[in-house]
Design a protein with these regions (language model features):
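Sec-dependent signal peptide recognition
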Residues: 2-7
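Hydrophobic h-region of N-terminal signal peptides that target proteins for export
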Residues: 9-18
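N-terminal leader/linker segments that initiate helical-solenoid repeat arrays
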Residues: 18-50, 57-64, 68-69
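Alpha-helix N-cap/helix-start positions at coil->helix boundaries
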Residues: 24-30, 57-58, 95-96, 120-121, ...
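Structural signature of alpha-helical solenoid repeat scaffolds
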Residues: 35-38, 68, 99, 103-106, ...
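Amphipathic alpha-helical scaffolding segments comprising HEAT/armadillo-like alpha-solenoid repeats
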Residues: 41-53, 71-88, 105-116, 135-158, ...
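Cyclophilin-like peptidyl-prolyl cis-trans isomerases
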Residues: 248, 252-256, 263-477
């Protein structure tokens, strides 16, 4: 397969005049049929064979690439494709190098200094590394107490470069490890705070403290992300002693909480669990949400059945507006504007339709439909990626219909934008932005865009920051 692809591509004319030839309406229609065949995963479609024989190298590449992706889910032959423009190169912020240098969990002197760093991501990293080895360091304990005690009643807003709930949440979990008694004294305030992220972190702190009473309360929280964190912690501490809570959670609508409950119920000795989880599975099947596959799989396993019994709804092949133009290299850009309550600012991404036209056109359509407005960046790992665009602010809640992979030859470099998946062809419309070079991700994840402006805003995003809007913008002249 790889040799055949290479041999075919060697025949592609290199002349610039050939690349610049104006395509006809019929040519564009052929590209559209090729893209539809790729989306259907139909390598027998005549459009692919016709495209592979086309006189224009752009059309031939699109057809050959489609055939390769259909036949090989990993598309190992992608490296034999003609090279594409490289993404922009972005320098690292100096603070990330300091963050990266923090590795020793027992070096209390280094961690104490890092807690006073000028960059909050470095402080968070130091906080998250703290262990009981630093229990005797009064300066560290004082800093953690001050952060928790400074938590405002309304922690929904922050200025650029600052924090709102974040410091107190991280400090609460660290204090549970370093000074459990002092953490217990502050748990009531954290666990009842109006900001759901604070309550979720309180559940993690309660897990460290083995505070099962608090976890039982949080497992009934109105926010599904809080429920998820509490159930995961409670099941670790009490095994099946709290199966009543997990069975009751199965009736909820939050995918993440129901999944956590199903995982907790696996192996339960209760006779009613099989029927309860099977009934919940049937309800989730009726919803027809492809992104809820993980929930359905967990429910099947809790019922003593095989997760492979689940069959997500089929992908509906559709040629969206701009897909053909993107495939042929159209420069389409989106501006991601952050909410003022999340520090404001914006960054611009260029869609890489030359490599992932189906995915890029789907993202463009969702942005035009205002799908992302008001959603958050729910996952922030300051030396890895930011991820967001979930209606439930959770990795298990995504678009109701899967988006297929379009693995290509753009490396996952700093500033590239990829599609979140949990398996082949399971794109859920959640973005992730690479904060550093993550080339190992290229094996499984599609790059569909790249940051072309505002990387400093990307670097400054914190967990829970809100996307105000995503709008199409014209390229700069």
């Amino acid at each position: 397969m790889r040799l055949a692809l290479l041999a075919t591509l060697i025949l592609l004319p290199a002349a610039a005049s050939a690349q610049a030839r104006q395509l006809t309406t019929a040519d564009s229609a052929l590209v559209g049929r090729i893209l539809l065949a790729e989306d259907r995963r139909d390598s027998s479609d005549a459009a692919i064979a016709e495209g592979a024989r086309h006189s224009d190298p752009r059309v031939r590449t699109i057809a050959i690439r489609a055939r390769g992706r259909i036949r090989d889910s990993r598309f190992a032959a992608r490296d034999s494709l003609p090279p594409v423009p490289a993404p922009p190169t972005w320098p690292e912020p100096s603070w990330r190098l300091r963050l990266r240098a923090l590795t020793a969990k027992s070096d209390c002197n280094v961690l104490r200094i890092a807690l006073a760093d000028s960059a909050w991501p470095v402080r968070f990293r130091a906080t998250d590394l703290l262990t009981p080895a630093c229990a005797g360091d009064d300066a560290i304990a004082t800093t953690l107490r001050e952060w928790v005690d400074a938590l405002p009643a309304d922690a929904s807003r922050r200025r650029a470069g600052g924090v709102s709930w974040h410091a107190a949440a991280h400090a609460g979990v660290a204090l549970a490890r370093v000074r459990p008694t002092e953490a217990l004294q502050r748990m009531s305030r954290l666990a009842s705070h109006r900001q759901p992220q604070v309550r979720a972190y309180a559940a993690r702190a309660a897990t460290v403290l083995s505070d099962t009473l608090r976890l039982r309360t949080l497992a009934r929280d109105p926010d599904d992300n809080v429920k998820e964190a509490a159930i995961e912690g409670l099941s670790k501490l009490t095994a099946h002693a709290d199966d009543d809570i997990y069975v009751a959670t199965l009736n909820g609508r939050g995918a993440q909480a129901v999944r956590a409950a199903a995982v907790a119920l696996k192996g339960s000795p209760r006779a009613d669990v099989r029927a309860a989880t099977s009934s919940a599975y049937a309800r989730w099947v009726v919803l027809g949400n492809a992104s809820a596959h993980d929930v359905r799989a967990a429910l099947l396993e809790a019922a003593g059945r095989l997760a492979t019994e689940d069959r997500p709804p089929p992908v509906h092949a559709e040629l969206l507006p701009q897909a053909v133009a993107l495939a042929l290299g159209a420069d389409i850009r989106l501006r991601v504007t952050m909410a003022p309550a999340s520090g404001g600012g914006s960054f611009v991404v260029r869609l890489r339709g030359d490599v992932a036209p189906l995915m890029a056109s789907r993202i463009l359509a969702l942005a035009r439909a205002r799908y992302y407005d008001g959603l958050t960046w729910q996952r922030v790992e300051h030396d890895f990626v930011i991820q967001g665009g979930s209606p439930g602010a959770n990795e298990y809640v995504g678009l109701s219909e899967f988006i297929r992979d379009e693995l290509g030859n753009i490396p996952h470099l700093r500033g590239t934008v990829g599609m979140s998946t949990r398996g082949h062809d399971t794109g859920d419309a959640q973005w992730f932005v690479n904060l550093r070079d993550n080339q190992r991700l290229g094996r499984d994840y599609t790059v569909f865009a790249e940051v072309v402006d505002g990387i400093d805003v990307v670097d400054g995003i914190l967990e829970g920051d809100i996307i105000a809007s995503i709008d199409e913008v014209l390229p700069r002249p």
